[in-house]
């Protein structure tokens, strides 16, 4: 299954969650798109509830189904912690997400584009793979020739707060993951237990 590249607001309204993180797409119409979206949400089956939770998280991180399910399998091989919490931590450590968490982009989609276009380095080396797994202590920075991009400067200026598991130097436009993200650090609107149940059927 390919990555969805259409309007994020349509998916946000269908799933009832802000994919951009700005919640603007839900501010006016917090129901599914279409003329009868307001009336279409009936009671979901157990499977439907699990599927929707999985889709919410997958679209939130902008991943294909194959990427998402492969990462889920990897999380299950980690011996410490729960499967769901480990999965969430691996998602958070994706390079595109870390660029977003550091405040170098206003959305994950924008962060993914910055990585794809070669504007980001890890420990001084350019990395253009959004799924790159960031390790604790690695330095994520904007390339020197990209530091004057308005898209980056505007994003940094708009930051209100950053997660406690990242450090950021605004002067150098660089930061790092200072520890593995704990479950309580992450999105409370996601019930990862439903996703574990979905894949374990």
UniProtKB/Swiss-Prot annotation:
Residues 93-156 form the S4 RNA-binding domain. One of its GO terms (biological process) is translation. Pfam families: Ribosomal_S4, S4. Keywords: Ribonucleoprotein, Ribosomal protein, RNA-binding, rRNA-binding. GO terms for molecular function: rRNA binding; structural constituent of ribosome. The keyword Ribonucleoprotein applies. One of its GO terms (cellular component) is small ribosomal subunit. It comes from the Bacteria. InterPro entries: Ribosomal_uS4 (IPR022801), Ribosomal_uS4_bac-type (IPR005709), Ribosomal_uS4_CS (IPR018079), Ribosomal_uS4_N (IPR001912), S4_RNA-bd (IPR002942), S4_RNA-bd_sf (IPR036986). Part of the 30S ribosomal subunit. Contacts protein S5. The interaction surface between S4 and S5 is involved in control of translational fidelity. HAMAP family: Ribosomal_uS4_B. Belongs to the universal ribosomal protein uS4 family. PANTHER family: 30S 40S RIBOSOMAL PROTEIN, SMALL RIBOSOMAL SUBUNIT PROTEIN US4M. One of the primary rRNA binding proteins, it binds directly to 16S rRNA where it nucleates assembly of the body of the 30S subunit. With S5 and S12 plays an important role in translational accuracy. This is Small ribosomal subunit protein uS4.
């Amino acid at each position: 299954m390919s990555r969805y590249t259409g309007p994020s607001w349509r998916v946000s309204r269908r799933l009832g969650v802000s994919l951009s993180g700005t919640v603007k797409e839900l501010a006016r119409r917090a129901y599914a798109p279409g003329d009868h979206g307001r009336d279409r949400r009936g009671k979901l089956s157990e499977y439907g509830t699990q599927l929707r939770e999985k889709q919410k998280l997958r679209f939130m991180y902008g991943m294909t189904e194959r990427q998402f399910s492969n990462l889920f399998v990897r999380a299950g091989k980690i011996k410490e912690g729960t499967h769901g919490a480990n999965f969430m931590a691996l998602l958070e450590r994706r390079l595109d997400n870390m660029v977003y968490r550091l405040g170098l982009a206003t959305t994950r989609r924008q962060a993914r584009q910055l990585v794809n276009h070669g504007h980001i380095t890890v420990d001084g080396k350019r990395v253009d793979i959004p799924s790159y797994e960031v390790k604790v202590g690695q330095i994520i920075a904007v390339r020197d020739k990209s530091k004057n991009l308005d898209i980056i400067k505007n994003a940094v200026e708009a930051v209100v707060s950053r997660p406690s598991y990242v450090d950021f130097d605004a002067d150098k436009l660089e930061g790092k993951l200072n520890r593995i993200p704990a479950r309580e650090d992450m999105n409370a609107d996601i019930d990862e237990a439903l996703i574990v149940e979905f894949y374990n059927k």
